[in-house]
Amino acid sequence: MRELVVLGTASQVPTRTRNHNGYFLGWDGQGLLFDPGEGTQRQMIHAGVAAGDITRICLTHVHGDHCFGLPGVLSRMALDGVEHPVHLHYPATGDQVVRALIAVSAPGVDLRLHPHAGSGPVAEGLEIRPLKHRIETYGYLLTEPDGRTFLPDRLKAAGIQGRDVGRLQRQGTMGAVSVADVSIPRPGQRFGFIMDTAPCPGAEELADGTDLLVTESTFSDDDGGLAQQYLHLTAGQAGELAASGKSRTLVLTHFSSRYGDDATFLAGQARARAPGTTVIAAKDLDRIPVPRRRQPVGESARPATAIGLKHDGSS
């Protein structure tokens, strides 16, 4: 199952109903924790996310509201006896801060450090793009390998059924019939994660073609001057980003405490700029599924296991 669990939605200052940042993405047996701010360990308990579910931790940058929850999370993993390797991705210029946070954590986690810079793959299916903030910041893009969708009508016409469908999928051909003859391309799902940034090319690349896009929306459109001063997005700019990338679902978060606990008006500002996108103003402990790829129009279809392209990168 592919699902986003929102652990916190505040920006620099938490509120009575909004914890600091924190986002857990369950993705086919992987568990990616993004930007754990203060209190993330407790929010995980409320959300039912176990420390052992985490396989990767991804930091966009080392401002405190995006990383000060790291010691608590690592200490809980050590307490729970998590044995699998945990990969930690973060900007290389934040290495001193990250190592200090690790130093005050309980030992015992098999933690693999992956400082990064530039743009491109950092793990299989996981890429980064630079953003525009006051310190070095990166967004993340998680992609599923492209696959194909088998069409039952074409399979029937080719005389392929039952176990032969799986055999064709594995082998690529059966006699004169190829996978391409009885299926159509199915682009893999895409998840984009964009935190503190002003509008920039990297953000546009991360948003492009996403099924689920999580982006900061620190300020209202009425406070565009503050967004420009501090290099953040307004709700309307987040909507424009989703519209330019044809994102299917936009999740707004990282709200300034100046707006209180109701961020629905920010969703309205974003929705006005992205009429073709589902816009959600996130609340703490929301669970948001990654939208399934739409079935082809005009032909009955059933999904096949992904075949084909994979991203290469070090783990």
For each predicted feature, which ranges?
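Active-site neighborhood of phospho(di)ester-bond hydrolases with catalytic His/Asp-centered motifs
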Residues: 34-37, 54-62, 91, 192-197, ...
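Metal-dependent catalytic neighborhoods of phosphoester/phosphodiester hydrolases
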Residues: 69-77, 98-101, 260-269
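Active-site neighborhood of divalent metal-dependent phosphoester bond hydrolases
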Residues: 82-86, 91-117, 258
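Active-site-proximal loop/helix segment associated with metal-binding centers of metalloenzymes
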Residues: 127-206, 212-214
